[in-house]
């Protein structure tokens, strides 16, 4: 079957469902696609199609994730749903599916549960900027006061992790009723309310090309008579010939000028997000630039060595370590294109970290890396991946 052409007319937003096991994340995902495809076209996905999430690999880690898409009047959404709790942890930490916003599904019959809390914490740590709540299974709760109580608990939990609990949209409904075609307040109406909240509460994300220029250095060549060429894929922004750029990371930051941009052996006047380019630098020696540094718009990103991070440690079955690690463990941290050694400090109450755990850590690198909160990395030992992480907070 031919794939339908992707019409890029509406702005695109990435979202996903999070929340405790059996609170109805997958049922809600199916209900959203069912209701919205009837209204705005597209392809509905049944519960079992979503539940049989295919395996994918991100940073050497196998994750089960289901991807669905749907449209509202104003936007095109890509939505991820994970079958198991471990998949969520891995997904959010590796950034396999970057979310511009999350739909927290919480059963009105049960209230917030351990994974509800853990997913909110993870969302905070990995930088998911917005959360909308769908209070599910409201058809099973007759007591209005109980509903109010659950709503209050969820708001308090969000506020505890620095989300604006009081302003967060909370939609009451029943994914099951909506999926069965119920047109009432808790059925289809609730799904439309949710779609409306997605459209209005989650801002349209900045496109990569609109960000400040950043390109991780992959390779460096010296071309006689022309100077030094640095190759890589532009991560965000635009670089124009004649602009000043900084070389950041590993060594002290230096300023240089872009004197040429090449792509497929053709000269261009600029390179932009997504392009694989060679950038010619004026007056820069080949030994001044190395893999692992970045080229960036001056002042837009700084080098750091000390940060806190949320990490997932691979289990033995995933090819990770067979034994736990302890405080002051010194692996390599793979940022963008290179490894840097660093030491790990565990939280006070944590004596050791077992394969398969996720944990908050503090890291000190031996060399600075151009870094921002939300930057992903792999943890490696002698070239093999033993974990994945995301920078939560920069300390220095």
From Swiss-Prot:
Gene3D superfamilies: P-loop containing nucleotide triphosphate hydrolases, Translation factors. GTP binds at residues 19-26, 81-85, 136-139. It is found in: Cytoplasm. GO terms for molecular function: GTP binding; GTPase activity; guanosine tetraphosphate binding; translation elongation factor activity. Residues 60-64 are annotated as: G2. Its EC number is 3.6.5.3. InterPro entries: EF-Tu_GTP-bd (IPR041709), EF-Tu_GTPase (IPR050055), EFTu-like_2 (IPR004161), EFTU_2 (IPR033720), G_TR_CS (IPR031157), P-loop_NTPase (IPR027417), Small_GTP-bd (IPR005225), T_Tr_GTP-bd_dom (IPR000795). Residues 19-26 are annotated as: G1. PROSITE patterns: G_TR_1, G_TR_2. Residues 81-84 are annotated as: G3. Residues 174-176 are annotated as: G5. Residues 10-206 form the tr-type G domain. Mg(2+) binds at residue 26. Keywords: Cytoplasm, Elongation factor, GTP-binding, Hydrolase, Magnesium, Metal-binding, Nucleotide-binding, Protein biosynthesis. Residues 136-139 are annotated as: G4. It catalyses: GTP + H2O = GDP + phosphate + H(+). GO terms for cellular component: cytosol. Its main location: cytoplasm. SUPFAM superfamilies: EF-Tu/eEF-1alpha/eIF2-gamma C-terminal domain, P-loop containing nucleoside triphosphate hydrolases, Translation proteins. Monomer. Belongs to the TRAFAC class translation factor GTPase superfamily. Classic translation factor GTPase family. EF-Tu/EF-1A subfamily. GTP hydrolase that promotes the GTP-dependent binding of aminoacyl-tRNA to the A-site of ribosomes during protein biosynthesis. This is Elongation factor Tu. It comes from Paraburkholderia xenovorans (strain LB400). The lineage of its organism: Bacteria, Pseudomonadati, Pseudomonadota, Betaproteobacteria, Burkholderiales.
